[in-house]
Regions:
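ATP-dependent small-molecule kinase phosphotransfer cores
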Residues: 1-66
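A generic secondary-structure signal
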Residues: 23, 67-74, 121-126, 161
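Short helix-terminating capping/connector loops at secondary-structure junctions
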Residues: 28-29, 75-78, 129-133
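Hydrophobic/aromatic beta-strand patches that form the interior of the parallel beta-sheet core
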Residues: 35, 81-83, 136-138
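Conserved nucleotide-binding/hydrolysis micro-motifs of P-loop NTPases
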Residues: 39-41, 87-91, 142-144
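A glycine- and Lys/Arg-enriched "phosphate-lid" helix/loop adjacent to the NTP-binding pocket
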Residues: 44-118
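NTP-dependent small-molecule kinase module
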Residues: 93-164
Length: 164
């Protein structure tokens, strides 16, 4: 995908939208469902970034957008809370390099900056798209121990899905 986003963008994002919808609608065996990403972040961040960067043709963007609109208007997709691990693009880039996954080696800092800006506009400034739930922001530039402390301070909110 990262090597040829123009070719694989529509294919991957169609599959992501389908799997995210399936994940949202699957029967829950626990009182809380935690998801790394959602059908909303797939559309508002990753599809939007592909389109804005010129790597997704307008017709592909229109088809994905129409499907997304139909899904969100006709199927209940409840979201109780969004936990935003807010981190700078530079920190994310450093962590990608440390993680050393082969498929992530070609991800440029500029890509992470674009993704970061879309998240900030959506979840912090609330200037781009509807936010379907309250947002809990946890600073994630710090080391893991500080992040764990932030999680523990907010554990009740996160696990109960209660309002922030």
């Amino acid at each position: 995908m990262y090597q040829d986003p123009t070719r694989w963008g529509i294919t991957l994002q169609t599959y992501v939208q389908l799997t995210m919808l399936d994940r949202h609608l699957s029967t829950m065996s626990a009182p809380v469902r935690m998801m790394e990403r959602s059908i909303y972040s797939a559309k508002y961040i990753f599809v939007e970034n592909l389109f804005r960067s010129g790597k997704m043709p307008e017709v592909d963007f229109a088809v994905l957008s129409e499907w997304f609109e139909w899904i969100t208007q006709n199927i209940a997709i409840p979201v109780d809370l969004i936990v935003y691990l807010q981190s700078s693009p530079q920190t994310c880039h450093e962590r990608l390099k440390e993680r050393c996954r082969e498929e992530e080696k070609i991800i440029p800092l500029e890509y992470l900056e674009a993704i970061h800006q879309l998240y900030e506009d959506w979840l912090i400034k609330k200037t781009s798209f509807n936010v379907p739930a309250p947002v809990l922001v946890i600073p994630a530039d710090d080391d893991l121990q500080k992040m764990l402390h932030q999680y523990e301070e907010n554990r009740e909110k996160i696990l109960a899905g209660s309002n922030v």
